């Protein structure tokens, strides 16, 4: 049985992406088909979802600047602590698990995953999606940094910090940037699947993972609940806005850089 007999949906002729599989001698080469241009969330749907996120973000900012969320923030921070000494829930293993989870939103891991995703998209010739992801992440980092400097909210002191954290508190950088990176990755990688359920599962998974990263920052006592709420909403809003508004600039940039990328990417892999 040949590879074509076993996986007929994915093997066709003639070559499309240049990845050639010759599994048997004296037989025509078969080509692994990868999408030259995959699925993309429609700009209208992306902008509607982004608008919902931005409205929630704006309301949170307004309430924080008006000092209207003091009770909410205090209760949220103390919710994960027990007793008069405000010790965290559970055994030490729980604390380590939360620290490991929050690391997914840290600079090292989120950028490492982003670089791997961008490289994979370039490998399968989805240059526009790769460029859009890079532009989304870089611009999102700039936006979060600017908002932090403008608001200048100090870190909470209601409970002890269980992880190292520096800089301003609002909005949460872990929450904002992880939402930008992981939702941007989900939207880009969804272009590789022809199945609606797979695509939306990836998007929902990114939303859940980043929401838990945001929650971990409150659990560790380094952010107010309003910090992470605004960060998550803002990051989601930026990823969706970029998907709708920056696709064409990213396409033009990718097309302009195509000759250099083609020269650096192997044209064919023969077996």
Feature-to-residue mapping (PLM):
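Generic alpha-helical transmembrane segments of integral inner-membrane proteins
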Residues: 51-56, 112-119, 134, 138, ...
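Hydrophobic alpha-helical transmembrane segments
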Residues: 44-49, 62-63, 111, 118-124, 130-135, 200-207, 217-218, ...
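Transmembrane helix-loop junctions and nearby membrane-interface residues
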Residues: 63-67, 149-150, 192, 218-221
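Helix-loop junctions at the membrane-solvent interface of multi-pass transporters
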Residues: 64, 123, 150-151, 246-249
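Membrane-embedded catalytic cores of phosphoryl/pyrophosphoryl-handling enzymes
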Residues: 3, 7-8, 156-271
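Membrane-interface loops
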Residues: 70, 74-77, 81-84, 113-196, ...
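N-terminal transmembrane-helix/juxtamembrane module of multi-pass inner/ER membrane proteins
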Residues: 3-109, 151, 155-162
């Amino acid at each position: 049985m040949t590879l074509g007999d076993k996986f007929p949906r994915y093997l066709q002729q003639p070559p499309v992406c240049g990845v050639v599989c010759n599994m048997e001698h004296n037989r025509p080469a078969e080509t692994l088909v990868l999408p030259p241009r995959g699925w993309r969330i429609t700009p209208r749907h992306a902008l509607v979802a982004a608008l919902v996120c931005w409205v929630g973000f704006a309301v949170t900012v307004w309430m924080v600047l008006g000092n209207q969320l003091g009770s909410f923030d205090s209760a949220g921070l103390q919710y994960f602590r027990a007793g008069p000494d405000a010790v965290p829930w559970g055994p030490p293993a729980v604390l380590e698990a939360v620290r490991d989870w929050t690391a997914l939103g840290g600079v090292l891991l989120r950028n490492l995953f982003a670089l791997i995703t961008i490289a994979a998209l370039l490998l399968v010739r989805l240059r526009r999606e790769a460029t859009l992801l890079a532009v989304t992440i870089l611009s999102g980092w700039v936006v979060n940094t600017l908002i932090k400097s403008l608001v200048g909210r100090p870190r909470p002191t209601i409970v002890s910090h269980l992880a190292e954290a520096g800089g301003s508190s609002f909005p949460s950088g872990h929450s904002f940037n992880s939402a930008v990176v992981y939702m941007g990755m989900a939207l880009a990688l969804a272009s590789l699947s022809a199945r609606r359920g797979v695509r939306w599962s990836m998007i929902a998974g990114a939303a859940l993972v980043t929401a838990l990263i945001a929650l971990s920052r409150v659990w560790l006592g380094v952010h107010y609940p309003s910090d992470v709420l605004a960060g998550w909403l803002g990051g989601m809003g930026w990823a969706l806005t970029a998907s709708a508004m920056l696709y064409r600039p990213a396409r033009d940039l990718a097309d302009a850089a195509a000759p250099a990328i083609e020269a650096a990417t192997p044209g064919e892999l023969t077996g």
